[in-house]
A protein has these predicted regions:
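Structural preference for beta-strand elements that scaffold enzyme active sites
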Residues: 12-16, 41-42, 68-74, 100-105, ...
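Glycine/proline-rich, positively charged
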Residues: 23, 85-154
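Active-site beta-loop-alpha junctions enriched in small/polar residues
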Residues: 20-22, 46-48, 74-78, 106-109, ...
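N-terminal binding-site loop/beta-alpha segment at the start of enzyme catalytic domains
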Residues: 1-69, 130, 136
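Active-site mouth loops of central-metabolism enzymes
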Residues: 13-26, 74-83, 113-122
Length: 154
């Protein structure tokens, strides 16, 4: 499968299997297993999808070496501080039951609770710092953002 190389040298498959709306349990488990059997090597989930346990179990049960599967999960809107981001990451890793994560994303740039007084900008900077620390600690191979517009990155 074709892949792209990220700025830090990590290779990411261009096509990923998304698990949004895949109900935790047998539905998500079977969906991910079948996607992997069909040749997908990038699995995308998120804390808010509430299916990380099934996604992780399917990855482990697939028989495909972990290093051949690119796994992405995302930080939800309610965890936008340094400590909350680190705790949320650890919770996701516990549910996924994986040794490392390939890509961790801030799911949304401007959560409703943080819109007053542009608090989201400060909070996202804290979250980014936490993600950089997790990256430096070797727990994440790459970090990034999801659903951001150019104005959110200025």
């Amino acid at each position: 499968m074709k892949s792209y190389t990220l700025n830090n040298g990590v290779s990411i498959p261009v096509l990923g299997f998304g698990t949004w709306k895949a109900e935790n349990g047998e539905v998500a488990y079977q969906a991910v297993l079948e996607a992997l059997k069909a040749g997908y090597r990038h699995i995308d989930t998120a804390a808010i999808y509430k299916n990380e346990e099934s996604v992780g179990r399917a990855i482990r049960d697939s028989g495909i070496p972990r290093q051949e599967i690119f796994v992405t999960t995302k930080l939800w809107n309610t965890n936008h501080s340094y400590e909350e981001a680190r705790q949320a990451f650890e919770q996701s890793m516990e549910k996924l039951d994986l040794d490392y994560l390939d890509l961790y994303l801030i799911h949304w740039p401007n959560p409703k609770p943080l819109r007053e007084n542009d608090a989201w900008e400060t909070r996202n900077a804290e979250v980014w710092r936490a993600m950089e620390d997790l990256y430096q600690e070797g727990k994440i191979r790459a970090i990034g953002v999801s659903n951001f517009l150019p104005k959110h990155l200025d």
